[in-house]
C-alpha cells in the first residue's frame, strides 16, 4: 500500500507548532542534506490539498543531487499526483444531471439501485417517524421499490415483509433475474473484539443478508455466513456479479478508527460463500474505499475513495478487470464536474451503460435521485440479457 496522506489531528497540531521553524531551517540552510523537513512540509500541504504550496518542496528534493533516492521517488510520485489533480480541474467531462421525477419527493431519497434489467429501481427514503421504518433521530428509513412505467419510474412503494420491519435496512444488490436480493442490516451491539480501546462500546454492526423470491414472495432474510458477518466487523454495501458467483462489499475490520476497504467473496460449490478477500492495490489504499458497484458486464467496478487523487472528499472512480488474470487495472477518476469538493458515492450505472444514477442534494435541501448520460470513456462493456426459461422439449 502507498503511504497515507491524511493528516491525523495530532500530526497537524505537531506540524503547525513547528511549521515556521522548519521553513526557517530550509531558508537558512538550503544545502542541508537531511531533507526530512522539506518532505514533511510538502506532505503537510499536500494533505491539506494546498498543492501550489506543496509543489516547491517536492521540486526542491527532485533538484537536489544529495537527496536520498527514496525521497526522490516519493517527491516524484507526489508531483505526478499534483499534475493529475490539475488535469482533473482543467479538463471537465460531459455532465448534465436531471432529477428523476417520480421517486424524488420532498423527503430524502438516496442509495439507488437498478435491477439489471432496468425494470425496478430500489432506494432508501427517509421520512418522519410516524411512518414505518427504522427510527433515526425523529426520522425513519424505508426500503422502497419503484417500477418502470414507459420511460418513467413510479413514486415507489415500501418493500413488503421481510423488509422494513424495524432494523436499519439499505444498500442493496439484486441478481440479473430479480429473484435474489442482498441487503445490509445494521444492529447496535457492544463491541467484543481485540481493539481494547473500543471493547464494550456500542457500535453499528452492519451485516449482509439475502432473500430469494419464490412464488412471487420474498423469503425470510438470512445471513450470508458467519465467516463474513462477524460481531466485530462492519460489512455492508453488497454488489453481486451477473453470474451470482462473486459478491463485492465494503468492510471495516476495526469499527473504531479502522479504514474502509472493498472486499469480495466467492460462491462455493455447496452454495455457501467463501472467506472475505481484500481486493488490495490498486483498488484499496491506506485511505477509505467504499460503495462498490460491479456492473452487469462483470468487469467494470465503480467505487468511492477519499485517497486516490480527486477533487476532494470521496470521489467516484472506475476500474476495469483484466479478463485473463482477474486483476483490476489502475482506477480512473470519473472526472470533474461529476466529482466535486464534496462527497460522491452511491453511484450506479444502467445495464446498457448509457445512464448513471446517484443521490444528491444539489437541487435544494433534500436528497433526491438524479441521472445523467454517462460519457463514452467511463461506460462499461455492452451486454445483452435474455429473459425466459429453459424447457426440455423431449
Regions found by a protein language model. Give the residues of each.
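Short, conserved micro-motifs composed of acidic
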Residues: 30-36, 47, 51-53, 63-389, ...
